[in-house]
Structure formats: C-alpha cells, structure tokens
Amino acid sequence: MALDLRIGNKYRIGRKIGSGSFGDIYLGTNVVSGEEVAIKLESTRAKHPQLEYEYRVYRILSGGVGIPFVRWFGVECDYNAMVMDLLGPSLEDLFNFCNRKFSLKTVLLLADQLISRIEFIHSKSFLHRDIKPDNFLMGIGKRGNQVNIIDFGLAKKYRDHKTHLHIPYRENKNLTGTARYASINTHLGIEQSRRDDLESLGYVLVYFCRGSLPWQGLKATTKKQKYEKIMEKKISTPTEVLCRGFPQEFSIYLNYTRSLRFDDKPDYAYLRKLFRDLFCRQSYEFDYMFDWTLKRKTQQDQQHQQQLQQQLSATPQAINPPPERSSFRNYQKQNFDEKGGDINTTVPVINDPSATGAQYINRPN
C-alpha cells in the first residue's frame, strides 16, 4: 500500500490495523486537522464488491448509539474507500488481554450494551448476521466505555422498512457468518431472522464466561465437514451443560432465543432485564469497571511505583514528592495465540485507562 495515497484529497493512508469480512482497514490521518480515522479499502476489481453496500447500511444506521460515523465514501485509484471513526480494541483483543476469561460482572456489563446494539439494528429492518467478539469494538477517549458494532458486509434486510412485511421463510441456505457463533437454524440451512443474531450473541456471552466453546478445535478435512461437526456438537450439547457453573440466566437466554419462531419479534427488554436483575443480585456497581480497565490500572500503578523507586534510588539524599501521573501513552505489545491456531494477534495496549488516544489493533480475519 502506497503510504502517500490520499483518500478524498483529505486523508492520508497509514499502516494496516485490521481486516473485515470484505476489505482491509488502515489507520488514516486528516491532513488538515491531524485527526486520526479508520479507512476501509476494497479493490475495485473484487469479484463480489461489498463496500458500497456496507456504506449504505451505515448511512441507514447513522446516529445510533455505538454505530461508527462514516465521514467519506468514494473511489480512489483502484480502491473503493470508506473513511470512518477510529475505534479502540475489539472484545476479542480485550479477551486475550485478560487471559481469555472475563468476570461475570464484565460479561453482564457487556450483555446490556450488546443486546441494545442488536435491537437498534433490528429496529432499522436489518440483521447483522455475523455477531462475534471481533465485530464489537470499544470506543476511545470520552467514549471508551461504549461498545460499538462494526462490519456490516453480511448484513441483510429482513423486512420492508415501510410495511414491515417480513422476508419469507426459506431453507437450503449456505452458512453465512462465523460457524463458531452461528445459530443452530443457520447450520440447518434456514434463512436467518432476528432470533439468529440473538442466539449468536448468547454463544458470545458463554464464550466470555467459559473461555472457549465445546465445538472449538474440532478436526475435519474440509470446511463442510468441520461445519457439520460444529453443528452436531452444538445440537447435542444441552444449554444446561453448556452453561454449567454459571448463573442459569445464560441458559434461560439461549433457550428463549431458540424458542422464537422465524418471524417473531424478540423481547429485547426481557433479555436485558434478565441480566440486569442478575447484576443487581450480585450487588455489582454499574461503574464501567471492566476487567481490562482494572488490569490497566494495576499496570499503571505498578509502573508509577517503579518510577518512584527509581527516583528515590537515584537521589537518596533528597526525598522528593512523587511526580504527578503523566498522560503519555505506554504501548505494550503482547502476542496471543488461541488454541486451535485461528488467532495470532498483536495487541498494543494502552496502560493508562484515561488516555484519550486510540488503541490500534490487528484484528483476526
């Protein structure tokens, strides 16, 4: 990628920071203001171009909480380009940062926002169809506690936005999305509807609690055979077994989503209340203190203590008051490798939770 490529005569392309279902994502800079943005590029020679469609979906969803704002779309040289808000790390990156386990409090804090994001997308007559940790990114700066949903390359309208006429029930459909989090009906080839996005979210929440899902790492010679094995394991694992060791609300959630009929409107408020009531019974405080926030704070405090000790060692005759915490960003690279070999991510993490800068990531494909 040429580093001097300009997008819309206003944005300079930088290094690659991630990949979506269709196209790669680069760090960009507004050459006038210096503001950093994310730029998604797709070759104009792509066999099945999707970026313009994704841009149209973003436009329809524009203004929703946790929906990134698109600043520019057009063709530049041999690329379709979309310029949008720069966001922080994905939930998959943060999961790795937290040693691949989230506390119950963090899972419940996330569940509340994630259900709301899906509800908003559905209210605009769209399905996401690829609900997974990689497609949820935290904000930066003042919006650092807000979960954002991205990657609408596989999104699909499930009803007419005026008449609300639902798409027809169909079978023999190919699997769309990510097999690990796909609903059972999606595996069975049934047309996706609202229930499927929510079932996928259920698997994401259980994944965060458990650290992995029973159908991860299954061996097969072809992709089709692997999908079949995942489906068989998913069907044969009762929700009570899948959620064993965790509050029954997770099993109740999954059983509810699986009980919905094709064109049913889910009761999003009921699902949120399910987890909010559990949150209250656990006497948690709604303070946005996620696991990664606490870990960064611990790292920051340790670093501050080390700096203080170094100062005292260097000047034993004069004991000075500890320096004020600086606002610089200290990036720390860590490589994480998920068992099964499908993730190998370098995640530069900001140790200062109050930092206003972006956290650049290389997201898994």
From Swiss-Prot:
Keywords linked to the UniProt accession: ATP-binding, DNA damage, DNA repair, Kinase, Nucleotide-binding, Nucleus, Serine/threonine-protein kinase, Transferase
Reactions accelerated catalytically: L-seryl-[protein] + ATP = O-phospho-L-seryl-[protein] + ADP + H(+); L-threonyl-[protein] + ATP = O-phospho-L-threonyl-[protein] + ADP + H(+)
GO biological process, one term: regulation of DNA repair
GO MF annotations in UniProt: ATP binding; protein kinase activity; protein serine kinase activity; protein serine/threonine kinase activity; protein tyrosine kinase activity
EC primary class: transferase
Binding annotation for ATP: 17-25, 40
Segments of skewed composition (Low complexity): 301-311
Localization, UniProt: Nucleus
Domain Protein kinase: 11-279
Biased composition, class Polar residues, residue ranges: 343-365
One term under GO cellular component: cytosol
Active-site residues per Swiss-Prot or TrEMBL entry: 130
Keyword Nucleotide-binding: yes
Highest taxon, organism lineage: Eukaryota
EC number: 2.7.11.1
Pfam families for this protein: Pkinase (PF00069)
Similarity remark: Belongs to the protein kinase superfamily. CK1 Ser/Thr protein kinase family. Casein kinase I subfamily.
Function comment: Involved in DNA repair. Has a probable role in repairing alkylated DNA and may regulate the activity of protein(s) involved in double strand break repair caused by gamma rays.
Listed name of the protein: Casein kinase I homolog hhp1
Gene this chain is encoded by: hhp1
